[in-house]
Amino acid sequence: MGQIASSANDGKNNAILESFSKEQIMDLLSSRCLTLLRNVEITSITNKLNVTSLREKNVVTPTDLALLLQLSNDMDRDNSSVNESFNRALKILYESTRVIGSLPFLSNYTKTDTSGGLTIQELLISSLVHSARYKKIFNSQYDYLKLIFCSLALPRLAVETNSEESSVDFLSDKPKVVEQVRYPIREEDSPDIRSKKVKWDTFNIINNYDDIDISSLKVNAYDLVQIITLFLIISSIPKMKRDLMHQKLVGYIERWKEFEVYGLYILKYININLNATNLQTETITFEEFQTTFNRCLPNFFQNGFSILFKEGLLSTVVAKAGSNNSSKDIPNNPEPQKQEEEATKKKKFKLPKFEESKLVNAASLSYISNVVSGLGSSIEISNQNLIKLYAGTEAGFSIRSLESKIFKWQAPTLFVVSGKRLKNKTIDTNMRYQQFKTEYPQYFRSSESNKHDWQNDNDKITYAILINQPWKNSNKKNFGDENTIILSLSPRLDFYKSIHSTVLNGESIYFNTLGLGIGFGNTQPVNKNGVKKYFPGDVSLTIEANLEFAVFRHIVASSANTSTYFERSHQSQVRSSDFEDRFMITDLEVWGIGSTKDLEEQRKQWEWEQKQAEARQSVNLRSLGEERAFLEMVGLVGNHNSSGGSI
């Protein structure tokens, strides 16, 4: 390490430069990461790793990492015995941690023995990155998503090159690197002091990702689905006691396939032609990866990794003596919990507890909530603020039944409709559909194919609509606002946000009780002189009055006769395509979404209605005694074998 004299051209403030060896930089960054840890965290981590110092050169095994990140609580259990796909995700996570831990020399991973282990130093650097503390020392413009992609792609590159010499001139190949420091580094400075003097935010090796040609890197599609699935599971578990969270985790891992299908739907936003049979052979480029996750799920990886490392390695929760499963927080304040329990006891009326349904379960809910959050909606969706208002399979597929169930809810709702794509035989022979077809204007000519290559006869089609305003009868005028979002949930992810218009004002929804059903993105339909007619928008979802058929329409070129309430798809293979999803409805559900205030107001409203119903019943029972004698006289109640009476 040596100081180099700087000139006036070195920078505006006559920057001080130092030359560093590769080993010196790695040691300095490791020391800087240690300074970002609190003393209680250092103590906790050393205990978990069973070491005396975090500067030791011990190796952390995949099993160790699973334990440290709370993905396992059994050191002797083989993860592959839990679930093969889960085991694959753990291996991906382990290698990703090794790559990020090699900062700032990311290319080191491809030059070392890929069978090597994760060092404590690499684990700490990776944990500081995933807990977002890197922002305290790196450039504010540092691209976390790019780093994640490198960490997922470099292991594949290392295997492909099979330790062959690389022709790429990495910065890390140079024996000495000259970088800027805040103050001159002195011989007597401790490692921590030296690490703080370095201007990490100007390090070329860091800001240029070790000069790796990221455009040439690729991630295996199957591997990406597995890591997405893992994070969908992790994000589905609410904050609770450690042992309860782990019970949930184990249960959801056993349901891996349920979550995995939504991981595939997310990836189909990148490439609509991906499917379960070609995942192993398909790859994803950085441009595809970046575009999709910045557009739909910008914080998905940051949130997933953050939960793992903050709740795992960096957590200061310690186990109770004599127990491997139960734990307590330090410090622990029982007062809020006591107050909550007392408040619960006082409530006579309880809101329905969340129970999974055919359309909304742990897997689909994690998928929906992550996408809604990623699209920037202020409406938070979780199993802790959802109440099922209507399910067609329970209450019957009737517009009146639907109206009676959802119109009293005065907060946002999630409307989910699902069904089977209509096949040509059904389209040609089903009389009820033929009637709907005469009312819904045809866009495609009869001679044109009504499906694209990515639309299959056996598709299960599911759409969800996030609605911010309360429902109401709208036979003449639409309602809604610009917070409404249409989501395509299956067989692929897509989204259609409300456009901003001072004319339309986001009033894109109608609930028609005059035999014209429900529409999103349509102009008001007409029922005149017994003739019904729909006016679908360019991007719209139309549900006919019997809740039997639905059509999602996506037309690229606007027409003077149609309205446009929603943005067209941004998916690269769909945005320029005209298409329709016509399906026969098999399930329809509406869920109320409430804040704490909304839920409390709704509880009071339902409690009042319950009291009114009980009061009416009480009045009826009391009056029945006085009127019974008269009713028996005229033969309406009592002894029906008698001839009755007359007055």
Swiss-Prot record:
PROSITE patterns: TLDC. Keywords: Cytoplasm. It comes from the Eukaryota. GO terms for cellular component: cytoplasm. InterPro entries: TLDc_dom. SMART domains: TLDc. Residues 325-346 are annotated as: Disordered. It is found in: Cytoplasm. Pfam families: TLD (PF07534). Residues 358-594 form the TLDc domain. The keyword Cytoplasm applies. May be involved in a process influencing telomere capping. Belongs to the RTC5 family. This is Restriction of telomere capping protein 5. It comes from Scheffersomyces stipitis (strain ATCC 58785 / CBS 6054 / NBRC 10063 / NRRL Y-11545) (Yeast).
